[in-house]
């Protein structure tokens, strides 16, 4: 690959080797004025990932190519310092999506070479690609559109036939997986932590604001902090841009509908998911909500366990057989605690009132005695 091309795909083995051969020290990347543009671009791509989209424009010229290439390792340092699993997922997803915008326009030979870097053995013929079904399953597993199911594909001699665009989409998943699995970084050098600290703090603060907005505004009167662990886990994954398994997606959606969230509110939760399709998602939510005449309750705990969706079990879970029962119990406990606190406050106000009244009576009595 030429250097200009490597700048679009800085997570490849070839790009990593190219940067390594430049012989640029960590100290230089962090402090040298020569790489100021690379640092600025690295900060920019992490901030853009926070918003959901890393914008990449065509690069030309040695200086621009170098800045784009070096911005990736600097961005990785920054993400490592943020040290938040959800944010790491969001960053990996944004990088993969940005790569896909270029991958879908590449020629078949380039895509085959690119796939080989990720251990994907494939062939192309007559604008179609074929890949081994094990690779297909590995990278299509997180894609929830029914068209990706193996049962909806032609399997011949262990190979799956797909279009160029579909192959590019699977390569996007390979990119996302590689980046996501490269975190957390085992040991961050002290000089990196020191340099990245102010930028990491800013990104953390912005991400926390996003999470709080997600947790309060979007839910209205619903109390997400009282959700059972399984639903809280599903929401955290959605927020991190992770596609849920169909069974967990149904469980979460039906739960949220039953606790009072609207169809539009739930739709907004999914708009960060990979392959988000507003029309299809809306249809699925409305179907669960009862648009066809059948309303659905979320699965019971036994069913959640059967499908591997029982996550983070706590003490209350031991006494509960249904996610809705968990939420109702939590709401009851919280309301009771609120009533008790209010009762104590009212009792304190009465005691204060009595003390004031007794004080007034004492003053009057003293005046009379005088």
From Swiss-Prot:
Binding site for [4Fe-4S] cluster: 230, 301, 310, 317
Keyword Iron-sulfur: yes
One GO cellular component, as annotated: primosome complex
Known cofactor(s): [4Fe-4S] cluster
Keywords: 4Fe-4S, DNA replication, Iron, Iron-sulfur, Metal-binding, Primosome
GO biological process: DNA replication initiation; DNA replication, synthesis of primer
Region (Disordered): 337-370
Superkingdom of the organism of origin: Archaea
InterPro entries: DNA_primase_lsu_euk/arc, DNA_primase_lsu_PriL
Co-factor binding comment: Binds 1 [4Fe-4S] cluster.
Any one GO molecular-function label of the UniProt entry: metal ion binding
Family label: Belongs to the eukaryotic-type primase large subunit family.
Quaternary structure (record): Heterodimer of a small subunit (PriS) and a large subunit (PriL).
Cited function: Regulatory subunit of DNA primase, an RNA polymerase that catalyzes the synthesis of short RNA molecules used as primers for DNA polymerase during DNA replication. Stabilizes and modulates the activity of the small subunit, increasing the rate of DNA synthesis, and conferring RNA synthesis capability. The DNA polymerase activity may enable DNA primase to also catalyze primer extension after primer synthesis. May also play a role in DNA repair.
Protein name: DNA primase large subunit PriL
């Amino acid at each position: 690959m030429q250097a200009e091309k490597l700048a679009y795909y800085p997570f490849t083995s070839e790009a990593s080797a190219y940067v390594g051969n430049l012989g640029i020290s960590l100290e230089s990347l962090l402090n040298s004025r020569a790489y100021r543009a690379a640092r600025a671009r690295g900060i920019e791509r992490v901030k853009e990932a926070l918003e959901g989209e890393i914008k990449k424009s065509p690069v030309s010229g040695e200086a621009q190519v170098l800045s784009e290439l070096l911005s990736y390792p600097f961005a990785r340092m920054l993400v490592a310092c943020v040290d938040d699993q959800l944010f790491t997922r969001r960053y990996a997803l944004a990088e993969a999506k940005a790569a896909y915008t270029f991958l879908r326009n590449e020629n078949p030979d380039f895509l085959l070479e690119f796939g080989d870097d990720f251990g994907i053995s494939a062939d192309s013929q007559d604008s179609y690609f074929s890949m081994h079904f094990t690779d297909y399953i590995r990278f299509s597993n997180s894609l929830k559109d029914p068209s990706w199911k193996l049962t909806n594909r032609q399997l011949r001699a262990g190979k799956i036939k797909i279009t160029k665009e579909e192959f590019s989409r699977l390569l996007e998943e390979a990119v996302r997986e590689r980046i996501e699995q490269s975190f957390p970084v085992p040991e961050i050098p002290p000089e990196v932590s020191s340099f990245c600290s102010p930028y990491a703090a800013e990104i953390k603060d912005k991400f926390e604001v996003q999470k709080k907005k997600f947790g309060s505004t979007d839910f209205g009167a619903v109390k997400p902090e009282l959700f059972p662990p399984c639903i809280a886990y599903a929401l955290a994954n959605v927020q991190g841009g992770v596609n849920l398994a169909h069974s967990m997606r149904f469980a979460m959606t039906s739960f949220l509908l039953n606790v009072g969230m609207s169809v539009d509110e739930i739709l907004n939760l999914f708009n960060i998911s990979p392959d988000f399709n507003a029309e299809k998602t809306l249809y699925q939510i409305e179907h669960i909500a009862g648009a066809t005449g059948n309303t659905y309750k979320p699965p019971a705990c036994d069913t959640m366990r059967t499908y591997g969706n029982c996550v983070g079990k706590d003490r209350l879970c031991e006494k509960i057989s249904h996610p809705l029962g968990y939420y109702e119990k939590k709401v009851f406990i919280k309301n009771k605690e609120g009533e008790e606190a209010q009762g104590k406050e009212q009792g304190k106000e009465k005691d204060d009132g009595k003390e004031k009244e007794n004080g007034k009576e004492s003053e009057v009595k003293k005046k009379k005695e005088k």
